[in-house]
Swiss-Prot record:
The keyword Repeat applies. One of its GO terms (biological process) is spindle assembly. One of its GO terms (molecular function) is protein phosphatase regulator activity. Phosphatase 2A affects a variety of biological processes in the cell such as transcription, cell cycle progression and cellular morphogenesis, and provides an initial identification of critical substrates for this phosphatase. The regulatory subunit may direct the catalytic subunit to distinct, albeit overlapping, subsets of substrates. PP2A exists in several trimeric forms, all of which consist of a core composed of a catalytic subunit associated with a 65 kDa (PR65) (Subunit A) and a 55 kDa (PR55) (Subunit B) regulatory subunit. This is Protein phosphatase PP2A regulatory subunit A. Pfam families: HEAT (PF02985), HEAT_2 (PF13646), PPP2R1A-like_HEAT (PF22646). Belongs to the phosphatase 2A regulatory subunit A family. It comes from the Eukaryota. HEAT repeats lie at residues 12-50, 89-127, 206-244, 246-284, 285-323, 324-362, 363-401, 402-440, 480-518, 519-551, 562-590.
């Protein structure tokens, strides 16, 4: 007969088993989340003898559950008794690595690699390497595909030269596997494997593998082999060896019949350039770069556009001006808007390298062209990078060249473009000075307060405070405050609301005199507005004014003028108005 303690010991595993077999997937997922708690309750021995075998046998479930299990098992070494017993986790993970769903297999591979790090040499050779070999020679491609991700961990952990030779040979078979679904992960992992072998082994064994994969009949394999070339270039280091082994494959990549392969080269061009060194860049990489900029496929041109700043950093200024800038000028009028948008985001970064004179001569005209682009994303990208150019050429020159276009964009039909311009205004204002700003941009800033998009009105209000801090209180009192206060009588309540929001935003930059003479009369009028939203926002504005008046040492204005108005609002018919008015009064009493 079982004792009470024995029953209690069995209870957690019984509950877990019940929940793992539950019809509802949420119960099964919850059970897996508590797996470590159950393992702690069982102790290492029972976890090894009961829990792990049970999990191993129950691998026949929905992908979400299997993925969670694969993830959990990677962190289970301590629960089975530490590294000495880590190998007991390999069996369920091997089964998970053979499943059909890629997400599950990837999680299983990650967990197997975690466990591998904990294994002793004996465990590695007795359990892990045979597991890798079994998966590599399995009938189903899913197992072979998973095995590709295990070789780096096994190889780096092994200290046995014979085992290492065996692993390299087995990996070579994966790179020549009949299924492209296996060759793809083999190519991905080959780029990592290269760093684990000697330089001579890389030349003798991995360059032939690279040549095979880079000439694969499947473009999905070829494009993944580009990273192998980058890795090999880093391992070889020598200019002569890189020229001998990798130059022809690079030319083949750039002229590959598949645009997806060329895209991969374009998107990672700087990564390759940084590892081959200045001599090869100058002699061998400029022409491929230009060819990709002129590629027939727009996605390739877009990808190479993102590489322009990074690649040009590695070139002499003269080469940039002679070889790269003319092609950029062609791309400014590219028929694909995504290419132009990528240019807009990236060409500004050339300004520091080109310097003031050449930026003015070459980049500013291109900026102006892109600021007039029909696509809003292109315009937006250029605006977002104006500050980089400003640091090189100065705001005066920038504003002279681009101000007309900026003013036009301030009224752009796309609100995100208008918003980007608003964000840029304080920088312009600071550099241009008050007279120039009032003449060219003052009315523009006020017009945004009446924009039909709330985000624009909100940004415009925040701008008013920044401008007040730049130009001073006197300027604000004479120029902007009368204009936004005049909106208190606007027939549309949204614009009356803008007046209140502007008061709340700008108040900390004002003094008690301005508040008493200009702000309070407006709020007194709006206290009786027919719209409840207006009235309760007036109450919130009063709350903002208190610390400003207190800082000025004038509490009588608040006590004699504002408190009576708040008390009036506490008796309002609308409960929201009552609430915010009461809250403002309570703040007053603190």
């Amino acid at each position: 007969m079982q004792t009470e303690n024995q029953v209690n010991d069995l209870y957690p595993i019984a509950v877990l088993i019940d929940e793992l077999k539950h019809d509802e997937i949420t119960y099964r997922l919850n059970a897996l989340e508590r797996l470590s708690t159950i393992a702690l309750a069982l102790g290492p021995e029972r976890t090894r003898d009961e829990l792990i075998p049970f999990l191993d046998e129950s691998i026949d479930d929905e992908d979400e559950v299997l993925s969670a299990l694969a993830d959990q098992l990677g962190n289970f070494v301590d629960y089975v008794g530490g590294p000495e017993y880590a190998h007991v986790l390999l069996s369920p993970l091997e089964n998970l690595a053979a499943t059909e769903e890629t997400v599950v297999r990837d999680k299983a591979v990650d967990s197997l690699n975690k466990v591998c790090i904990c294994l002793s040499q004996e465990q590695l050779e007795q359990y892990f390497v045979p597991l890798v070999q079994r998966l590599s020679t399995a009938e189903w491609f899913t197992s072979r595909a998973s095995s590709a991700g295990l070789y780096c961990a096994a190889y780096s952990q092994s200290e046995n030269p014979a085992v290492k030779v065996s692993l390299r040979q087995s990996f070579s078979h994966l790179c020549h596997d009949e299924a492209p679904m296996v060759r793809r992960p083999a190519a991905t992992n080959c780029a990592k494997f290269v760093f684990l072998v000697t330089k001579q082994e890389a030349i003798d064994e991995f360059i032939p593998l690279f040549n095979s994969l880079s000439n694969d009949d499947q473009d999905s394999v070829r494009l993944l082999s580009f990273d192998i070339m980058v890795s090999l270039a880093e391992v070889l280091k020598s200019d002569s060896e890189i020229r001998h082994y990798l130059l022809q494959p690079l030319r083949s990549f750039v002229s590959d019949s598949s645009w997806r392969t060329r895209y991969m080269v374009a998107a990672n061009f700087v990564k390759l350039a940084k590892v081959v060194g200045p001599s090869l860049i100058k002699d061998e990489l400029i022409k491929p770069f230009v060819l990709l900029m002129k590629d027939t496929e727009q996605e390739v041109r877009r990808a190479i556009a993102t590489q322009i700043p990074g690649f040009c950093e590695l070139l002499d200024k003269r080469i940039v001006l002679e070889e790269i800038i003319p092609v950029i000028q062609e791309l400014i009028n590219d028929p694909a808007q995504h290419v132009r948008a990528a240019l807009g985001m990236n060409i500004g970064a050339l300004a520091p390298q080109l310097g003031k004179e050449k930026t003015t001569e070459y980049l500013l005209p291109m900026f102006l062209e892109l600021l007039k682009d029909e696509n809003p994303e292109v315009r937006l990208n250029i605006i977002s990078k104006l500050e980089v150019v400003n640091k090189v050429v100065g705001i005066e020159l920038l504003s002279q060249s681009l101000l007309p276009a900026i003013v036009t964009l301030a009224e752009d039909k796309q609100w995100r473009v208008r918003l980007a311009i608003i964000d840029y205004i304080p920088l312009l204002a600071q550099q241009l000075g008050v007279e120039f700003f009032n003449e060219k941009m003052g009315n523009l800033c006020m017009s945004w307060l009446e924009d039909h998009v709330y985000s624009i009105r909100e940004a415009a209000i925040k701008n008013l405070r920044k401008l007040t801090e730049i130009f001073g209180l006197e300027w604000a009192t004479e120029t902007i405050i009368p204009k936004f206060l005049a909106m208190r009588s606007h027939p549309n309540y949204l614009y009356r609301m803008t007046t209140i929001f502007a008061i709340s935003e700008i108040a900390p930059a004002l003094n008690a005199e301005v508040i008493e003479k200009q702000i309070l009369p407006t709020l007194e009028q709006l206290v009786n507005d027919p719209i409840p939203n207006i009235r309760f926002n007036v109450a919130k504005a009063f709350e903002v004014l208190k610390p400003v008046l207190a800082a000025g040492g004038d509490s009588t204005v608040y006590e004699q003028q504002i408190i009576p108005l708040l008390e009036q609002l506490t008796k309002d018919n609308d409960p929201d108005v009552q609430y915010f008015a009461t809250q403002a009064l309570e703040q007053t009493n603190d």
